[in-house]
A protein has these predicted regions:
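Alpha-helical cap/lid subdomain in secreted, periplasmic
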Residues: 27, 46-183
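Serine-esterase "nucleophile elbow" of acetyl-processing enzymes
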Residues: 1-56
Length: 183
């Protein structure tokens, strides 16, 4: 009797960037489970209790937490962030950086400078851990802001934005486990 080959199983965990990702369109070759919830952040990932141990897990969150952070509490946030990511059970975990956003009409880049610093701290804290970090931050930027050609509302991505994420993830999944390609 022929063995039926199962589709690779991926669980996606995070905020609206995950929730709104048309996974079945971008990844029809995979069984994709979407645990994205709009408006959520660190507390959601810390409380995440779905058994995803038989999946490769893709995580992205943080943009909803930005305005609760400052120079005094950012290091504690990074500690909690990394601990939460490491606690999600998986065959392998792929963590996307926190994405840039455009919050001000005056074309300020300050929020994205802060997000860039936060991403660097998270990435450093993950060194030596069994997490593949997908840094697409610069690919989403134009002149220090989220590229307007990649967003529907200065925060959420459009099809072009999701194509960048999908390409980065697809290329990474084509590599042997625990090895991320240059994005």
């Amino acid at each position: 009797m022929d063995k039926i080959e199962e589709k690779p199983k991926l669980a996606f965990v995070g905020n609206s960037h995950i929730a709104f990702w048309a996974l079945n369109i971008y990844f029809p070759q995979w069984e994709c489970l979407n645990y994205g919830v709009p408006g959520e952040g660190l507390a959601y990932v810390e409380a995440f209790d779905v058994d995803t141990s038989d999946c490769r897990v893709v995580i992205q969150f943080g943009s909803n937490d930005i305005y609760q952070l400052n120079d005094e509490n950012v290091d504690g946030y990074v500690e909690r962030y990394v601990k939460a990511v490491l606690a999600v059970p998986s065959r392998q975990t792929y963590l996307f950086c926190i994405f840039p956003r455009n919050d001000y009409d005056d074309y300020s880049t300050s929020v994205n400078k802060f997000i860039c610093m936060l991403n660097q701290k998270i990435h450093r804290k993950l060194e030596g851990k069994d997490i593949i970090y997908l840094d697409v931050f610069d690919r989403l930027l134009q002149d220090g802001r989220l590229n307007p050609e990649l967003t529907i509302d200065d925060l959420h991505l459009n099809g072009k934005g999701y194509s960048i994420l999908s390409e980065a993830l697809r290329r990474t999944l084509e590599q042997p486990l625990k090895q991320a390609p240059d994005l």
